[in-house]
């Protein structure tokens, strides 16, 4: 939670920060913009400059970082950036200054949904794991109805990815 606070406090500063992530116990901040602003910020903030920084951020964006490899279930939490991290043992990767969090490990989706809701968000089983039931965060009836009406208006014949996200959509 200290890391989440740190990333969010940096993101609030009037600096050219365009990315904030926590991977393998390290915080990564991406700076981009006017050269003078980037240099001034890099000089003021402590840390190291990554030689392959562009490659690192691209790997995160396209889920090609080694964290995303492997057979263990991969869960994606989309939560409030300042919310406490759910109390789960196992590897985590935190991106978007805390708004997107990835967890690797076996878990019960109902338990994870409760944790995600407490953090102001949702969770989905992104890859692997038991896919015999819903893998996306369960939706309340009102949201289901809205999504079904939207789907019907954009795809009246139901030919585009039926049941891909939800069995009822």
What is the meaning of each model-derived region?
Residues 24, 47-169:
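Conserved glycine-rich FAD pyrophosphate-binding loop
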Residues 1-71:
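C-terminal substrate-binding/cap subdomain adjacent to the FAD-binding core in PCMH-type
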């Amino acid at each position: 939670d200290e890391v989440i606070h740190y990333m969010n406090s940096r993101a609030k500063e009037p600096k050219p920060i365009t990315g904030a992530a926590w991977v393998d116990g390290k915080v990564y901040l991406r700076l981009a913009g006017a050269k003078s602003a980037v240099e001034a910020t890099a000089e003021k903030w402590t840390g190291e400059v990554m030689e392959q920084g562009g490659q690192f951020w691209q790997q995160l964006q396209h889920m090609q970082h080694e964290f995303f490899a492997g057979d263990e279930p991969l869960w994606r939490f989309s939560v409030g950036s300042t919310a406490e991290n759910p109390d789960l043992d196992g590897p985590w990767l935190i991106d978007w200054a805390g708004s997107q969090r990835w967890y690797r490990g076996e878990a019960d989706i109902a338990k994870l949904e409760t944790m995600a809701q407490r953090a102001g968000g949702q969770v989905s089983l992104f890859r692997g794991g038991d896919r015999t039931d819903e893998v996306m965060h369960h939706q309340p009836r009102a949201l289901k109805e809205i999504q079904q009406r939207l789907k019907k208006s954009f795809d009246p014949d139901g030919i585009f990815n039926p049941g891909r996200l939800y069995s009822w959509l």
